[in-house]
Structure formats: structure tokens, C-alpha cells
UniProtKB/Swiss-Prot annotation:
<keyword id="KW-0132">Cell division</keyword>
<keyword id="KW-0131">Cell cycle</keyword>
<comment type="function">
    <text>Possible 'checkpoint' protein for cell division in the blooming process.</text>
</comment>
<protein>
    <recommendedName>
        <fullName>Blooming-related protein 2</fullName>
    </recommendedName>
</protein>
<dbReference type="GO" id="GO:0051301">
    <property type="term" value="P:cell division"/>
</dbReference>
<feature type="region of interest" description="Disordered">
    <location>
        <begin position="1"/>
        <end position="20"/>
    </location>
</feature>
């Protein structure tokens, strides 16, 4: 998971859609 993704999505509340 990239930092940019974390900044956009925040904490994983949607499940493990992206485990990259």
C-alpha cells in the first residue's frame, strides 16, 4: 500500500481490498 493511497483512503475500514 502506497502512502498516497493511505492519504486518500485513510484507515482500512473497507476490508482488505488492496494488500499491495
Amino acid at each position: 500500500v502506497s502512502a498516497e493511497y493511505l492519504e486518500r483512503q485513510g484507515p482500512k475500514d473497507d476490508x482488505d481490498c488492496f494488500d499491495d
